[in-house]
Structure formats: structure tokens, C-alpha cells
Amino acid sequence: EPDAVTIFGKTWDFHVREALRISLEENLELIYDSLAYLKENVPEVIYDAEHFFDGYKANPEYAIKTLEAAQQAGVDCIVLCDTNGGSLPYEVAEIIKKLKKKIKTPLGIHAHNDSECAVANSLIAVENGAVHVQGTINGFGERCGNANLC
């Protein structure tokens, strides 16, 4: 029996329609149902909101709805993912400040390093209230890597 589990879900409406090929509402149900089930069976559930920053920039209302579905399911932490690594620190700061007014579940950050901002984005996220940071030793990770925790 695991003490904790991390699962990801789609937050960008483009990916919901084009990759999953389901409706936006079906995706919200999928997020809620999956996380609620896990929360009933595992003490700690962490939700990684994949492509959150891209999704937020394209359709903030829907991206926030995906986080609200996770929050309603009772997750312990919602991790905002800069999956393509293209967000800049000022964007991360502004978005987290806005989210803190709507989302009461603790927030985290998962930053990729495509624009060489993974560490900066992680630090600015913590400065603005994130309590969970995902990264790797020496920054190793897919494409250009993730936030270097060393």
C-alpha cells in the first residue's frame, strides 16, 4: 500500500480535445473521479496539472475549472506544471497570485527548463505561496531538463 501517489491530468483545453479526444466536461469528470477514488484509497494524493501554464494562457477559465475539480476531490496538493518550459518568472508569479484567491488547496510547481527558467520559476513560485517543488538531481529530465534541486 503506498503512502502517497502523484497523478497527472490535462488542463489545457487544446490537449483535452486533440490528445484525449473527449469533451471538456468529460475531462473534468475524469479528473474528479480519478482523484476522488485515489483519495479514498491512498493517504496523500498529489495532482500534477499538466501543461497548466499553457492552458491558463489559452483559456484561464477552463484551466481553473480543472484545478477546482481536483480540489473538490480532496487532493493534498495541486502542482502547476510548466510542461513545455516556456513560462517566464513574472508569468508564474502573476498566475499563482491570482490562483491563491480561488484555490485553497496547497499549490506546487513542476518546471521544465526549455527557456532556462526552471529554477527561477520554482523559486518565484515558492515566493508566491507554492509549498511543493518537483525537480531532479542536476536538472536531468526530458528535453532540456527540470528544475535542478542541487
Positions of PLM-derived features:
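Structural motif
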Residues: 48-50, 81, 110-112, 136, ...
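Glycine-rich phosphate-binding loop at the start of an alpha helix
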Residues: 64, 116-119, 146
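Short gly/pro/ser/thr-enriched loop/turn and capping motifs at secondary-structure boundaries
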Residues: 13-15, 86, 116, 139-144
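Glycine-rich phosphate-binding active-site loops on the catalytic face of alpha/beta enzymes
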Residues: 9-11, 128-145
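Alpha/beta enzyme core
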Residues: 1-107, 122-130
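Small-aliphatic-rich amphipathic alpha-helix that forms the alpha element of a beta-alpha
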Residues: 110-137
